[in-house]
Every structure is written in structure tokens, then in C-alpha cells.
Design a protein with these regions (language model features):
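Short coil-to-beta transitions that initiate beta-strands within beta-rich domains
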Residues: 68-79, 111-121, 153-163, 195-204, ...
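Ser/Thr-rich, Proline-interspersed low-complexity disordered segments
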Residues: 36-38, 43-59, 676-696
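Short loop/turn segments that connect beta-strands within beta-propeller blades
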Residues: 99-103, 141-145, 183-187, 229-233, ...
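Residue-level detector of Asp-centered blade-edge/turn motifs that repeat once per structural unit
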Residues: 80-83, 122-125, 164-167, 206-209, ...
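Blade-level signature of beta-propeller repeat domains, shared across WD40, Kelch, NHL, RCC1
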Residues: 69, 344, 350, 355-357, ...
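A short loop-to-beta-strand structural motif that recurs across blades of beta-propeller domains
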Residues: 94-97, 135-139, 178-181, 223-227, ...
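Conserved beta-propeller blade signature
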Residues: 85-87, 96, 128-129, 138, ...
Length: 697
């Protein structure tokens, strides 16, 4: 064989080196391609196997995030700052701020330990003071961005009213603790009850001279109005002419005339609005044109001379002749339980409403009103149902039904035909129909059905079940069971086998009638949880025809929630009664016996239970959310991200992707940041590098 020359060898070595580099580059490219973030689109030639695992929460990440609704809330207190910003204190949702005249709202609760806000007042420096249900007074010196408790000397921490005089002295009216004063911007408080009668002070007012007016109540009777002319050091009763001592609100006009709004429960007298033109020495009834059915929770005197009265159920009334005559001004006011007012420098009037109605604004002296709740998420959500396509239905207590088709990013109110707005239960049927159970309020209640994804609703109460419907459950055959909360044999469980068209009372064996929860297992056995009668749980194995008590070991019998896991175990969430009981119980034998499973459960008043596809149990309590990954044996607090962190949860549901949704008392709906069950692709096999031809030698 002919020996190759040195040049030929060099050329051969170069070609071999090139071939090797090409081969290695192919391997490297294949490895790099496998290491890049995957787009989620499956390869055309590789089968994508899915494995279901428990969701893992990244460290230091909150478990929950608030969704964008449902919007609204109880506008308990309103105030306007010197800069024109509007603040609203809500029941359960804390404080919200609007910097654009109510067009949008932002929650500002950093440091606000109690989000049940009953009073707001702002001084000339822009410092904001919030009176809370059970945690006293909080102060913000940075426009609400942060809050600090200022309760030194304030022995009664349930604050219902706040006012500030021209010197900056702050007065706080408390719930059965009397009146307190702070002369140092809230740093310290002094009790001021000399001469005052009733210790419950729902309203305070200060005139231009610094005289303080206090509405007072006692345990057994109403005590009317007291006045202090020495900055609160002493008080004098001024009830001459008051035919109703149950005062709830005040307003003082530019002339110094004092207006007082009263309750109308009949226990404290008669009359709704009173006027004094002599600083409270005497009062006269001024209610011509006012409706007689509801009390006056709010009063407002504007710089233009108009007086506005907010009633609990009849909306807003306006007087342009100093109270002599009143006219209803409710155009656009869709919620007419009005409980607070404020007015800005431009004369725009804001009205806070109850039962979730939120805030309304009028820019034409009350002639028309527009709802302004964008970003105001402080609703009370008592029920959640999720359809198979992950459409979420949220039943609120006061504003009816909301729906979200994008995991809570946006919500729309869907109340067409839904005349009862105090929703307590929801269920989705196999045929896609949605059923809503409502409390009986204002003459409306019972069961409603939607056959078009919530676009419209129909009252389906044939068979007389217009009661408080606290629970709904639907079996695999589409039979619907409604648990009503009505004592005695008239209440209990009702069944419909025709999509709600008609109902049959199926209470054989159950004499309690106070049904709070329902669940159905894979065998079709029905479990009914009762409350208030000591019966605990009933079970039916024949589609509701007969019932038997199933309570062995169930030491707490107020059963607010029931859930069944994939392994057939039944869980009962209970609530305490007079400080006793509460907690979670498990049955692994179809309800025959129960075992208490509370290890790690630090809040024992349980309102809701939900179980994901891998058997992890979630419990909603008065003290936040808990999770068990071992069949209830141990519980972990998963309340982070809630507002407040351990606030009440009244409803729970989990969608098909494993995301948990929580209905809260004052914060709308929250969603778990991560799915509680995570579907992840199995590792893809690394592509085998395609052989490349060896260059010819």
C-alpha cells in the first residue's frame, strides 16, 4: 500500500477533526434544546405523559391572593381628606382609598390588625383615624399607606364613632365604654363620662363652637342626647322635645342647627329626624315626606344648605328647606340601605351602603347616583360553586350572584331573575344547571335555578320551600337535596327529582329541621349536618326517604360543613356553642363512628370544607384556612395572603386544575397562588443525536 504523504495525513486529520466537531455540536445542541424552558406545546413525535402530584408552595410565598371581586362591600364609614382623597371603612375588608374621586379604589390595610372598620375621621394635617370593631383606634400619617394602633388609655376597644374639633382634639364613642378624648393626636386617651348616661355611643358631632353632642344608649333602654360645652369634661342631658331617644346619627349645618336621626324599632319612641335651632336645648320633629319604615343611619349637611338623610331601606332623602320637607332622591341608587355620607370640596356626595352595596356618588346634589365600586373588594361571600369548565359562581350575602370565567381576574354580577340576594348555598348539576339557595330576607328566599350559565334565574320553590336554604347537594342522578334552616318538622331536607320543578319534604326521622350542611358519598348515601338542636349528623341510605342519626363519637353537634374524600372518609366541620365544642371529625365507616381530628387546628369554628383530587383537605374557619395532607391527622395553617391574615372563611371550592378558592367575610374571593394539585409533564427523553456521515477520506 502506498504510504500517504505528510500533507495527505494533515488533510486527513483535519477532516477527522471537523467530523468530530460536527458530531459533538449536534449532541450539544440536542442537550441545550432539552434544557431550555419548555413552551408547553407537546412534541409531534414524543408522547406527553402527565403525572399528578401535590402542589408545592414556594418558600416565602403567600398561599392566597385576592381576586378582583366580587366588587362592593359594606361602606360603614366615609371621610374626605384635605387633599380630596376619599376613604371608606368597610366591614371585614378594612380601609380603601380613592385618589380619583371614587372612580377606583385601593385597599390600604398595612398594619391595620382589625379590618372591621366602624368609624373614620381625618384632621387638618391629613392624619387618618380609624375606629375598629374590637381593636381600638388606628392612625395613619402617610395617607393610609400604613397604620399604627394608638390605644394607650383606651380601655374600651370597640369604637363606633370619631370626631375632631378645631384644636385637633379627638373624641371616640365606644360600644358600652362611653366617650374618650385624646389631646395629643391619639397617643393617649382619657375617659370622659362625667354626667353621661348611656355607655354605648354610636354617634358624635361637634359644632363650630366646640360643643360636643353624643348619642347614647344603655343596655336596657335608649338615653338620648348628651352635650358637653367644656370639651367633654362634663355632660348634660338635652332631650327636651325628643319623642325618640334612639339616636343613630347627627349633622350640623352652617347656621349651627343640629339634626339628629333616630332608629324606628319602637322601643325608644317614635320619630325619625329631629332638629334643634338652639344648640340642643330643645328639639322638634321634622319628617314631612320621610317614609316611616326605617331608621336614619346617616345625616349630611352640605355647604349649599341641603340636608341629606340616609335610611336603612328607603334610600336617600333630601331637604332644601332646613328639614321642613323631605324628598326621596334615589335615581340610580340600587342599594337603599344607606349608612354613611361624605362630601368633597367640589360638592360631590358619596353614600356608603350596607349588605355589600358599596359606594355611590352623586355629582348633582343627589338627583342621580352612580355606583363606584371599581377595586372595592369587601364583599361577604357565603357560597362558591365551580362548573366543570372552571366557571366560578360566588354567592354573596346581600348583592346576589357574581360569575368569573377567568379564575377570578374579572367578575360580573348576574342577578337577572334572582330576586333573593342573600345567598347561602350553591350547587352545580350534572346537566350544567346551577342552583342557588338563599336566606329568607325581605320576604324572599328559597331555591333559584339557572339553565343558561347564570344569565337568568328562575324561582323554583314549588312545594313551599321558601325558607333559609343553607345547604344544597346533587347526586349522580341529578336529584337535588335542599337543607333548610327552619326549626321543627316544617324545616329539614327537601328533595327534587325533576330539576327543581317540584319538591318533596323528606324529613322522616329528622325532627330537628335546622340543616346547615349536606354531602353525598359515592354510594349515594346522604349526610345532613344540623345545628342548634344537638342532633349532629343524620344519614340516609335510601335517597332521603328515611334518616338515622349517625353521631357516635361526634362530641360537637353544630355541623356547619360536610365533605367526602375519594377514599370514602367523611369529614364534619363543627362550630362551638357557648364556648364549647367545635373542630373537625372524621368517619371511616359511613358515619357509624367519628373521631376528632384537630391536631394543629388552632381555630375550631369551622365553616367550610373542600377536598382536592389527591385527598388533601382544606378547612375554612373563623380564624383562617387550614390544610391536611394526611386524612385529617394533622393540620397546617395556610392563611398567609388573606386579608386579614386569619380572617373568616365561609366557603371553599377547588377547580379542575387544583386551584382553591375561598369566600371570605369582607374580602370577596381569594385564590390559592399555586394549584393544590399540580399536573406536571413527565421528563422528556433526551433526543438521540442523528448520526452524521463520516467525511470521505
Amino acid at each position: 500500500m502506498k504510504k500517504k504523504s505528510d500533507g495527505q495525513c494533515a488533510f486527513l486529520n483535519l477532516r477527522l477533526l471537523i467530523a468530530l466537531l460536527v458530531f459533538l455540536s449536534g449532541v450539544a445542541l440536542a442537550m441545550f434544546a432539552d434544557a431550555r424552558p419548555r413552551s408547553g406545546k407537546p412534541s409531534s413525535n414524543v408522547a406527553q405523559k402527565q403525572t399528578v402530584t401535590a402542589g408545592v408552595q414556594p418558600p416565602n410565598q403567600a398561599f392566597w391572593a385576592q381576586t378582583n371581586g366580587p366588587q362592593g362591600g359594606d361602606g360603614i364609614a366615609l371621610a374626605t381628606s384635605p387633599s380630596g382623597h376619599i376613604f371608606v371603612g368597610t366591614q371585614g375588608g378594612g380601609v380603601f382609598r380613592s385618589t380619583d374621586n371614587g372612580e377606583t379604589w385601593t385597599g390600604i390595610n398595612n398594619g391595620l390588625a382589625d379590618t372591621n372598620v366602624r368609624a373614620l375621621v381625618i384632621n387638618n394635617a391629613g392624619h387618618i383615624f380609624a375606629g375598629t370593631w374590637s381593636s381600638g383606634v388606628f392612625r395613619s400619617t402617610d395617607n393610609g399607606d400604613s397604620w399604627t394602633a394608638v390605644n394607650n388609655g383606651l380601655d374600651s376597644l370597640s369604637v363606633r364613632s370619631l370626631v375632631i374639633n378645631s384644636s385637633g382634639d379627638i373624641f371616640a364613642g365606644t360600644f358600652y365604654g362611653g366617650v374618650y378624648r385624646s389631646v395629643d393626636n391619639g397617643d393617649n386617651w382619657t375617659l370622659l363620662n362625667t354626667g353621661a348616661a348611656g355607655p354605648y355611643v354610636p354617634a358624635l358631632a361637634i359644632n363650630a363652637s366646640g360643643d360636643v353632642f353624643a348619642a347614647t344608649w344603655d343596655v336596657k333602654f335608649c338615653t338620648g342626647i348628651f352635650r358637653s360645652t367644656d370639651n367633654g369634661d362634663s355632660w348634660t342631658e338635652i332631650n327636651n322635645g325628643l319623642t325618640n331617644l334612639g339616636i343613630l346619627s347627627f349633622a350640623i349645618n352652617e347656621n349651627g342647627d343640629v339634626f339628629a336621626g333616630a332608629d324606628v324599632d319602637g322601643l325608644c319612641g317614635n320619630g325619625r329626624v329631629f332638629r334643634s335651632t338652639n344648640n340642643g336645648d330643645s328639639w322638634e320633629l321634622v319628617q314631612s315626606g320621610l317614609s316611616t319604615g326605617n331608621g336614619i343611619n346617616a345625616l349630611l349637611a352640605t355647604s349649599g344648605g341641603a340636608i341629606f338623610a340616609g335610611s336603612y331601606g328607603d334610600g336617600v332623602f333630601r331637604s332644601t328647606d332646613n328639614g321642613d320637607n323631605w324628598t326621596p332622591v334615589n335615581t340610580g341608587l340600587t342599594e337603599q340601605r344607606v349608612i354613611s355620607f361624605t362630601v368633597n370640596q367640589n360638592g360631590d356626595i358619596f353614600a356608603g351602603t350596607y349588605v355589600g352595596g358599596g359606594v355611590f356618588r352623586s355629582s348633582d346634589n343627589g338627583n342621580t347616583w352612580v355606583e363606584r365600586n371599581n377595586g372595592l373588594v369587601a364583599t361577604d361571600v357565603r357560597a362558591i360553586a365551580i362548573k366543570s369548565d372552571n366557571t366560578i359562581f360566588a354567592g354573596t350575602y346581600g348583592t346576589g350572584m357574581d360569575r368569573s370565567s377567568d379564575t377570578g381576574q374579572s367578575w360580573e354580577q348576574i342577578n337577572n331573575g334572582l330576586f333573593a340576594h342573600f345567598i347561602r348555598s350553591l350547587a352545580s348539576a350534572p346537566n350544567g344547571h346551577i342552583f342557588a339557595g338563599a336566606d329568607f330576607v325581605d320576604g324572599l328566599g328559597g331555591v333559584f335555578r339557572s339553565t343558561d350559565n347564570g344569565q337568568s334565574w328562575t324561582d323554583v320553590n314549588q312545594g313551599v320551600i321558601e325558607f333559609d336554604v343553607r345547604a344544597l347537594a346533587i347526586n349522580s342522578n341529578g336529584h337535588i337535596f335542599a337543607g333548610t334552616y327552619v326549626g321543627g318538622t316544617i324545616g329539614g331536607v327537601w328533595r327534587s327529582t325533576d330539576d327543581g320543578e317540584s319538591w318533596t319534604h323528606v324529613n322522616n326521622g329528622d325532627n330537628c329541621g335546622l340543616i346547615w350542611s349536606l354531602a353525598i358519598d359515592s354510594q349515594g348515601h346522604i349526610f345532613a349536618g344540623t345545628a342548634g338542636c344537638g342532633d349532629g349528623v343524620y344519614r340516609s341510605t335510601d335517597n332521603g326517604d328515611t334518616w338515622q342519626l349517625a353521631n357516635t363519637g361526634l362530641t360537637s353537634t353544630n355541623v356547619a360543613a360536610l365533605a367526602v374524600s375519594n377514599n370514602g372518609h367523611i369529614f364534619a366541620g363543627t362550630r362551638s356553642l357557648i364556648g364549647k365544642g367545635g373542630g373537625i371529625f372524621r368517619s371511616s365507616d359511613d358515619g357509624e363512628t367519628w373521631t376528632e381530628e384537630d391536631n394543629g387546628l388552632t381555630a375550631l369554628d369551622v365553616n367550610a370544607l373542600s377536598i382536592n383530587s389527591v385527598g388533601h383537605i382544606f378547612a375554612g374557619t373563623d380564624g383562617g384556612a387550614f390544610q391536611s395532607k394526611n386524612d385529617g391527622a394533622n393540620w397546617l395553617d395556610v392563611s398567609s395572603g388573606l386579608i386579614p391574615p386569619r380572617g373568616p372563611i365561609d366557603a371553599l371550592a377547588i377547580d379542575s386544575e387544583g386551584f382553591a378558592f375561598a369566600g371570605t367575610a369582607g374580602g370577596g374571593v381569594f385564590r390559592s397562588v399555586q394549584p393544590t394539585v399540580r399536573s406536571t409533564p413527565a421528563p422528556r427523553p433526551r433526543p438521540t443525536p442523528r448520526p452524521r456521515p463520516t467525511p470521505p477520506l
